[in-house]
Design a protein with these regions (language model features):
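Thiamine diphosphate
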Residues: 1-126
């Protein structure tokens, strides 16, 4: 197996899944800049930047999953997941039970975690 950085492995896995399933979409803050190779290969309809509102775009991911897409929601820093927990815990996680099994919201949520960016305590979880 080739030796890859963590970022390269994520990029490769996303590209592999996006090539295999046209329902896989990626969105998040500056995701088109973070994943330029994916944006070039799959286009703006599948690699979509989102506004700086984690709760809004995670909720959009839940809706996209309910509509049949397979979203990968990239939250820039793990610190910001907390502001989006309502969509994740009260909607995505409980949807199947609340709907008697009629609805599901399969999605992936990714976030960077760790220090070293010099962005301050609310951006690093160092």
């Amino acid at each position: 197996l080739p030796e890859l950085t963590f970022a390269e492995a994520i990029e490769r896995a996303l590209a592999q899944e996006m090539a295999a399933d046209e329902r896989v979409v990626v969105f998040g803050e500056d995701v088109h800049l973070l994943r330029p190779a994916l944006a070039a290969r799959f286009g703006a309809e599948r690699v979509m930047p989102a506004p700086i509102s984690e709760s809004a775009f995670l909720a959009a991911g839940v809706g996209a999953a309910m509509a049949g897409l397979r979203p990968v929601v990239e939250i820039m820093m793990v610190d910001f997941v907390a502001v989006a927990l309502d969509a994740l815990l009260n909607h995505a996680a409980k949807l199947e039970g609340f709907s008697g099994g009629r609805w599901r919201a399969p999605l992936v949520v990714r976030a960077a975690c760790g220090g070293g960016y010099g962005d301050g305590g609310q951006h690093e979880q160092a």
